[in-house]
Amino acid sequence: MKDFLIIKACGHKDENLEIENIKSLAELYGMNTKVVCIENYDSLQEALTSNGQYDYIYLSSHGGSDGFCNELRTLDVKWMEFGELICESDCLKGNSILLLSCCRGGLNEVAYDMFWNCLKIEYVVGPRQSLTSSDLLIGFHLLLYNLEHRGIDPIVACDKVLKGTDIRFKCFDRMETESDPAFIARCKELDKLFDIE
């Protein structure tokens, strides 16, 4: 049985409905679910280190190209920090998928920084544009339907979200991304920035 961690970190008025819906959907597909409410960096760290290993991690938050936050700004995490937390906590099973339910969670820079910082991350999925909660919910519904019910590859499942809704979801597969010249350039930039040879 698969395990599905839902991180509730946004605080907007529609978030409870989004989380209840995603939780029900994961359970419909036979997954064990765990919902954690995050208010700051320490509670995020605690949630990732004390709850076991997961096939999916679903992050509900406000997001941008640099990181994610909650509405009150008591939580403000860079994508690289999130990748580091995931790596250190050993919370991912093999072939796990990070579902970033936040604006801009599907940008190249987000996946590149996460992959650079944590070799345990296999897939990163998120929207490439700013969306409402209902748009995000529909997109993730279609994605999970295609992944879990139909058994479709994550990248193809994201393509089906676009075809069905015109919502631009993007899935980054570590194995494919590692040969991308833009990813290689970003890695060199980060290596230089952090003095890694």
Model-found features: residue ranges?
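Caspase-like cysteine protease fold
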Residues: 76-88, 150-197
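Catalytic cores of nucleophile-dependent amide-cleaving enzymes
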Residues: 74-137
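A domain-level signal for caspase-like cysteine endopeptidase catalytic cores
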Residues: 1-56, 94, 101
